[in-house]
Design a protein with these regions (language model features):
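Conserved phosphate- and dinucleotide-binding cores of soluble alpha/beta proteins
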Residues: 107-111, 116-119, 123-153
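Leucine-biased recognition of intrinsically disordered, low-complexity hydrophobic segments
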Residues: 3-4, 8
Length: 153
């Protein structure tokens, strides 16, 4: 079991007190639309989806049904979790949206997608991915540096 998974289990264990002002009710997960070369990436994504669902924490993600995005969403759904996906219109047209999620929000642009995810999430997790994942992660990190939010990353 990886360090990320162990830390998440600790965070979402019953009776854990968070060193934050508010309880985490939703987590935005930034990750790849591909699974990557290392099978541990998909395993970590599945573990994360399962942990969030069992803790009653809503998964906020990029709405894709492929790659690590699909893995984390499928795992959360399989364990009774609530899953909200945000996707820009042009990606819906490519038929990339996950058909089984709890809620699908369609945005006009990628920037609106990131803003919607940030607005809805109480915390952020980044898993392996490509340039898009890096863009999402660094934008959230920059917003925190600029004091636009104080949510855990």
């Amino acid at each position: 079991m990886g360090l990320l998974v162990r830390r998440l289990i600790e965070c979402f264990s019953v009776g854990t007190r968070f060193p934050m002002q508010h309880k985490i009710r939703s987590v935005a997960v930034f990750c790849g639309s591909r699974s990557g070369r290392n099978p541990e990436y998909a395993s970590a994504a599945a573990d994360l989806g399962r942990i969030l669902a069992r803790a009653g924490v809503e998964l906020i993600f990029g709405a894709g049904h492929i790659g690590l995005m699909g893995v984390v969403a499928d795992a959360a759904l399989a364990h009774g979790g609530k899953v909200a996906g945000m996707i820009p219109k042009h990606l819906v047209d490519w038929e990339l949206a996950h058909p089984g999620i709890t809620e699908l929000i369609i945005t006009k642009t990628m920037h609106e997608r990131k803003a919607a995810m940030a607005e809805r999430a109480d915390a952020f997790v980044a898993l392996p991915g490509g340039f898009g994942t890096c863009d999402e992660f660094f934008e959230i990190l920059t917003w925190r540096q600029l004091h636009l939010h104080q949510k855990p990353i």
